[in-house]
């Protein structure tokens, strides 16, 4: 069976096939008008506002992005095929036309591939046996000296994973809660006198996961949106600058200690306090992203202390290890943290001076977490 290849790109998401009508959109508002369950989402590049429609998609195709872009990360979490960095999908694919997205061969075909349609149809009834298989192997998993922690972005997905043999959530991303559940820039809540509403919503999203797996820990990473992503939230344009390269800009700890964002960071801290002290979810820990310097780290920890969050026997503070500086000064940073979570995507970006969202460099093979320089710095850490 031969179908015309419409676009080629970079592999991302689940390795497999997605078949359905293409829906070419330029923004989340357009997606809200046209996306239905099983459609193929085609857009320039996704951001957190697209998540509700990504959940509907049978597959995702983007013009831009690399293996660590938003579309790649979310599609892996949702378990759907994804091809990114095609450069021209929005120009050559047409809304309403059937297409087949093959994330194994990293292409999108024009039309529905009959053999793949048959495979997808027959596999629909396999879910119960797969779940039974997972449940059946649970008891056979050996005890290991190494603890197994999971990553999680979409809180409600914990229901699919909670019975798996893992010791905790090592990275819970708050960005999905901010984009899909809250939707408004935190400083807009502050300015309009609704700070408590923001705290309650964020705490509610975090508690969904913490309650489901307690007493296993949930390491909640404080927000790590880039400026361009914050601008997409309601009211965001009032509070965010425009940066040429947001990946290397005002993000992570540098936001928390700034006069422009500190009030919002304090709300995030208050949400953690609410989970732990009001609701008794002592399994909620935290992690700081994009830790660059010792002085900023100490400043962040002081703000946390003022809000009632201090390292203790039952409250751990981890750092994302994703900047060269934290690896080089690991002995000093380790005095301030209870653990590190290696962010190999950003570490690779920093070591090789590569924009991880560059589709061109991704296509050329430059973005490689196995590069000897990256491996050596991680080994040093």
Regions found by a protein language model. Give the residues of each.
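Acidic, glycine-rich flexible loop/linker segments
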Residues: 4-40, 44-172, 185
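Conserved alpha/beta-domain cores
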Residues: 133-381
């Amino acid at each position: 069976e031969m179908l015309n290849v419409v676009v080629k790109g970079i592999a991302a998401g689940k390795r497999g096939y997605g078949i359905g009508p293409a829906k070419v959109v330029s923004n989340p508002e357009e997606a809200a008008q046209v996306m239905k369950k099983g459609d193929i989402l085609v857009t320039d590049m996704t951001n957190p506002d697209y998540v509700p429609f990504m959940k509907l998609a049978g597959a995702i195709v983007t013009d831009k992005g690399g293996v660590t872009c938003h579309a790649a990360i979310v599609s892996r979490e949702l378990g759907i095929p994804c091809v990114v960095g095609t450069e021209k999908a929005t120009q050559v694919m047409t809304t309403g036309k059937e297409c087949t997205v093959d994330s194994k061969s990293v292409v999108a075909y024009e039309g529905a591939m009959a053999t793949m349609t048959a495979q997808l149809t027959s596999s629909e009834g396999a879910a119960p046996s797969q779940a039974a298989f997972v449940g059946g192997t649970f008891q056979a998993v050996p005890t290991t000296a190494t603890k197994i922690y999971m990553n999680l972005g979409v809180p409600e997905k914990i229901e699919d994973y909670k019975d798996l043999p893992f010791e905790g959530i090592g990275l819970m991303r708050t960005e999905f809660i901010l984009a899909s559940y809250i939707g408004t820039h935190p400083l807009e809540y502050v300015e309009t006198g609704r700070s408590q509403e923001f705290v309650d919503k964020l705490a509610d999203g975090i508690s969904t996961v913490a309650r489901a797996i307690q007493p296993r820990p949930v390491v909640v990473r404080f927000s790590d949106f880039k400026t361009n992503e914050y601008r997409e939230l309601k009211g965001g344009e009032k509070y965010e600058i425009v940066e040429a390269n947001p990946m290397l800009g005002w993000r992570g700890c540098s936001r928390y200690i700034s006069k422009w964002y500190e009030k919002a960071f304090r709300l995030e801290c208050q949400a953690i306090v609410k989970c732990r002290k009001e609701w008794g979810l002592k399994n909620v820990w935290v992690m700081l992203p994009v830790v660059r310097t010792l002085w900023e780290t100490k400043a962040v920890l002081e703000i946390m202390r003022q809000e009632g969050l201090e390292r203790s026997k039952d409250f751990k503070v981890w750092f994302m290890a994703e900047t060269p500086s934290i690896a080089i000064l690991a002995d000093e940073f380790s005095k301030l943290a209870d653990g590190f979570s290696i962010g190999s995507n950003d570490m690779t970006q920093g070591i090789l001076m590569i924009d991880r969202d560059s589709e061109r460099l991704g296509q050329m093979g430059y973005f490689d977490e196995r590069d000897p320089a990256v491996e050596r710095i991680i080994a040093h850490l």
